[in-house]
Amino acid sequence: MGSSLWTCLILLSLASASFAANPRTPIDVPFGRNYVPTWAFDHIKYLNGGSEIQLHLDKYTGTGFQSKGSYLFGHFSMYIKLVPGDSAGTVTAFYLSSTNAEHDEIDFEFLGNRTGQPYILQTNVFTGGKGDREQRIYLWFDPTTQYHRYSVLWNMYQIVFYVDDYPIRVFKNSNDLGVKFPFNQPMKIYNSLWNADDWATRGGLEKTDWSKAPFIASYKGFHIDGCEASVNAKFCDTQGKRWWDQPEFRDLDAAQWQKLAWVRNKYTIYNYCTDRKRYSQVPPECTRDRDI
C-alpha cells in the first residue's frame, strides 16, 4: 500500500473516533477587534475588510502584530497560510508571552525551507524564564496552499498544542514535580514574520534568498476566547467557570492521545525529552506528558 494512501486511511480512522474534549471552534471577527500592529505597519496588508491580513518580509524588515489584551488561560487560535516557495531563512510565528524578565511563553514557530523541502514546526514552552523544551515535527500537509488552524488550549491542568483538530503536544502541570507551570502571569498573543537565517534553516547553513522577496504569510480568524486580565493580575476572576476549566479539558481522552501518538510516531524529528546528549536525565515533566 502506498505511503500516501496509508496516511489517508490513518487520518480517516482517527477522525472517525469519538472524543468528548475538543476545543470549541473559534468564530470569525475582523483583525481590529482584538489585535494591533506592532512594527513596520506598511508591511501589513488588509484584505476583505480586515477579516484577513498578510505580513510581508523584505530585506529591510519583517512585521508583526499583537493582541490588545492580556490573558490568563483560554483557547487561542489563528488560521495561517505560510510563505510559499523558497522560504529558507524565514520564521513565521504565533505565540503567547508575558512581559517580565522571568517570563512565560508558549510558541509555534514555522521554520522555512528551500522549495520542495518541508516546513518544520517548532514548539517550545517557557516557564519562569526557562525554555529549552523544543520539539520539532514535519506537517502532514502543505501549509502554504490553504489555511490551517493552529491553537493552544491553556488551563490550570495542561497546555495543548493543536494543528487543526490534532493535538501535537501536551505540557502538563507538573508543579508537584518541581517544574514551573504558567498560571499567574497574563500573556499577550503575538504573530510575526521575520528573517532568522542565522539559525532557522539547517542551523543557519541556508540563507534567505532576497531575490524571492517579498515573502508573504497570511492570517485570519482573529477571535480570542480567553480570560482577559490586566498585565499585573495574578488570577482570572472567572477561574473555574469557563468551558476550558471543565473536567473534560483537564486531560486528553483516548482518541486524542491516539492522534497525538500518530503525530509523534510519524512526524517527530526532534524532542528534547529524548535528547540524552543535552539532558543526561529525563526532564521530570516528560514522563507525565508521555513524551518518552
UniProtKB/Swiss-Prot annotation:
Xyloglucan binds at E109, Q122, T123, N124, D132, R133, E134, D198, W199, G203, R278. This is Xyloglucan endotransglucosylase/hydrolase protein A. Catalyzes xyloglucan endohydrolysis (XEH) and/or endotransglycosylation (XET). Cleaves and religates xyloglucan polymers, an essential constituent of the primary cell wall, and thereby participates in cell wall construction of growing tissues. Residues 1-20 form the signal peptide. SUPFAM superfamilies: Concanavalin A-like lectins/glucanases. Keywords: Apoplast, Cell wall, Cell wall biogenesis/degradation, Disulfide bond, Glycoprotein, Glycosidase, Hydrolase, Secreted, Signal, Transferase. Induction: Up-regulated by indole-3-acetic acid (IAA) and fusicoccin. Effect of IAA is however nullified in 0.25 M mannitol, which prevents cell expansion without affecting auxin action per se. Predominantly expressed in the phloem fibers of growing internodes. Expressed in xylem cells in the basal part of the internode. In the internode, it is expressed closer to the top of the internode compared to XTHB. The keyword Lipoprotein does not apply. The record marks D107 as: Important for catalytic activity. The keyword Phosphoprotein does not apply. Residues 21-219 form the GH16 domain. Disulfide bonds join C227-C236, C273-C286. Gene3D superfamilies: 2.60.120.200. One of its GO terms (cellular component) is apoplast. GO terms for molecular function: hydrolase activity, hydrolyzing O-glycosyl compounds; polysaccharide binding; xyloglucan:xyloglucosyl transferase activity. Its EC number is 2.4.1.207.
